[in-house]
Amino acid sequence: MKLRTIGLTVALCFFAGAACFAADDPHMGTWKLNEGKSKLTPGEGKNTTVAYEAAGDQVKVTIDGTDKDGKPTHNEWTGKFDGKDYAVTGDPKSDMRSYKKVDDHTLAMTVKKDGKVTGTGRVVVSADGKSRQVVTIGTDA
């Protein structure tokens, strides 16, 4: 597979838009894109708001943004940070996603479409919990 960088170093810095939902998990809450501190790949879409919230014993991740043409996007994922695949709804580029906790501030993510890995990445929340960095790498499946 030929690798291509989606978001090159999609050093997406986000700032918490609301108080943390769960004090023991720095990922929880609503994160908003700070374009001034982000390195976005030209011609790609962007996630402007990402919300993590408790859903029973799982986590619901809701992502809103725009596609490469500026049209609104919305997708949702509900699952656990256990490295297993859970369904994604609303995203034409993926149908499954998994997150796995690397440490208290880092999640590893894998994105799939039709059973094939189409992307991997990491989500890292800063030590002070006020920003996060998302780096993704896509593959030509």
Set out the residue ranges of the language-model regions:
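Bacterial N-terminal signal peptides that target proteins for export
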Residues: 1-10
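Bacterial N-terminal signal peptides
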Residues: 9-18
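Hydrophobic small-molecule pocket/channel-lining residues, especially in calycin-type beta-barrels
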Residues: 20-141
